Amino acid sequence: GQAPDIVQKAPTVVGVWENYKTYLERGRNLSEWHRHVPSFYTADDHELLNDIYGTGEVGYVNRRAVFRDIATSAWFDYLAWANPVEHDTPAWFGAGTFKAGSDVLADSSADFTKLDLNALANLHVHWGTSTAGVKDAKLDAESGDPNSAVYEIVEVLGPHRLRINPPAKANGSQTYPIGRRCYGRFSVSNCDFFLLDTRSHRSLHNVDNPGNPKATMLGKQQFAWLKDGIENSKADFIFVVSSVNFMVPHVGSGGGDDKQLTIKKDDAWTVFLREREELIEFWDGLDKGVFVLTGDLHNSFAIRITDNVWEFASGPHN
């Protein structure tokens, strides 16, 4: 029979599926856990690709960044399918035609007028190599498709055309996804939980300029959703679940063959100080406790940020 549409447009998703399949087959205790314990999840870089940055940075050319939607789709297939998401529109995968210098993407098989772009993320053009999702730093130096990059969708021009930014660099065809929004919320008793997506919309950080007012961890839409949801919450306690740490930087490498060499490493909110400090000030002014649950860093700790705001981090000790 015919391969699924996503395999035709993003064949490297099969490798991600195989990873999940292998973990569940070999990790008997892990498989038992998933069988018996209902869970909600947040994705971090290792669900996508190690040290993935700049997925929301318009014009950014990076193999890891544009693997986002392939990995996220597999994550939803195996883990996040039950997550309480704010938007349940899956990523859209298409095959586009590009002309050098043109800001128009054409796809005769698409009907962009039927897509709710407010429920979707930005557009990436795939790297286009069979090793695009392999965890190996040496591959970062290898070239991908000349049009592979992070793009802004400027406007829908018709059923088969989008205006994008930046313009294409070369004539050609390549597959692309328009990403999904993975964040959501749920309530238990008198507590509201907000599950953040800290990888899909983040701009490039700068360790040497962590206070850059334009830098964003969450993107404008998710940031506004978070503040609005908390401001209008009737709960007595707020739990904000972030895959990356809030107060402690994550700058150390785990070693091996996959060190991120294209940008100085820091996965945490410590390089997005404008957003972080705005949230702390906002939370501290509430008449309810706010607890930020974080991971990523291979350590565990508790930090009293203010009398009203705490971070509790839980990570593997290795």
Q: What residues fall within each predicted segment?
A:
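Long, structured stretches of catalytic cores involved in phosphate-ester chemistry, encompassing
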Residues: 1-318
